[in-house]
Amino acid sequence: MRPARALIDLQALRHNYRLARELTGAKALAVVKADAYGHGAVRCALALETEADGFAVACIEEALELRAAGIKAPVLLLEGFFEASELALIAEHDLWCVVHSLWQLEAIEQTPVRKPLTIWLKMDTGMHRVGVHPKDYQDAYQRLLASGKVSRIVLMSHFARADELDAAATEQQVAVFEAARQGLSAECSLRNSPAVLGWPSIKSDWVRPGIMLYGATPFEVAQAEAARLQPVMTLQSRIISVRELPAGEPVGYGAKFISPRPTRVGVVAMGYADGYPRQAPTGTPVVVAGKRTQLIGRVSMDMLCVDLTEVPEATVGSPVELWGKQVLASDVAMQAGTIPYQIFCNLKRVPLDCIGE
């Protein structure tokens, strides 16, 4: 059996969820969209179900997967619905739904539903992706109430630059939100992972922890609360070949690495088809047999090479951690010029094994 595996620590997941609650004193929707950022949405939701206030997913397909697994907690559709015909399913399965565009509001007004809906009305406060314009927000709120199709409305927005701790844009977005919602007596939701960790002055009734649930920091710099996160995923494999090379020999496709000295090279059963970033350069950290070393050469589809010169005890079968508790996913992502969100979501072929259930 190929040794590439992703170990999912569900106790760490619970710790990170509790941290979001502790830091905010708010109710928290655990964001499990995109298969829980590659960690397995159903497993993660089941692990959190007894304590989570609810879950958030991107679309109805992801929500129905949770319902089919027996998850009865509230589930919010972050992108809302894509066509009016979905409203019947939303009502049938008791899902919560974001409304971010006036066409969705009109669809609710015009479409019969079996029971009133819980709507999260999203305002565009400056990200300019989706959301009702601030000048239209009060009217949209009143139209939802007047439709007779809605039992509850939560007011929400999304931050564009909360991961930049010195960015004035976040405070500006809060100011836009507060001005536009003035006089509306409804619960609010503003804080995503970086806002939960790094913006304690922002208050909201609901928070939406995403990347922090999985133990990865959303920041490019060290941050005290992010340091309390516990990595949930350990991507691991084993050495499948070892060879000794003299100085001046190439390693891998394109000969992008030339051994500067006699070099002991280990080949790991892990590649970009598994989701490991192909763009990770020589020098990206790896742990072999408990010792930190580095990637060398270009990542292949199914294999990559590591420098074992300073790990003489490593041999065929030695364990390898690509990221996890000893090598942070954020460090690998930074080396590869990307973000931990992406490298987690890219894992498609690697089996997931859970601990801490």
UniProtKB/Swiss-Prot annotation:
It catalyses: L-alanine = D-alanine. The gene is alr. Catalyzes the interconversion of L-alanine and D-alanine. May also act on other amino acids. GO terms for cellular component: cytosol. Disulfide bonds: none annotated. Pathway: Amino-acid biosynthesis; D-alanine biosynthesis; D-alanine from L-alanine: step 1/1. PANTHER family: ALANINE RACEMASE (PTHR30511), ALANINE RACEMASE, CATABOLIC-RELATED (PTHR30511:SF0). GO terms for molecular function: alanine racemase activity; pyridoxal phosphate binding. It comes from the Bacteria. CDD domains: PLPDE_III_AR_proteobact. NCBIfam families: alr. Its EC number is 5.1.1.1. HAMAP family: Ala_racemase. The active site is at 33 (proton acceptor), 253 (proton acceptor). Pfam families: Ala_racemase_C, Ala_racemase_N. This is Alanine racemase. GO terms for biological process: D-alanine biosynthetic process. It is an enzyme of class 5 (isomerase). The modification N6-(pyridoxal phosphate)lysine is found at residue 33. The keyword Signal does not apply. It comes from Pseudomonas entomophila (strain L48). SMART domains: Ala_racemase_C.
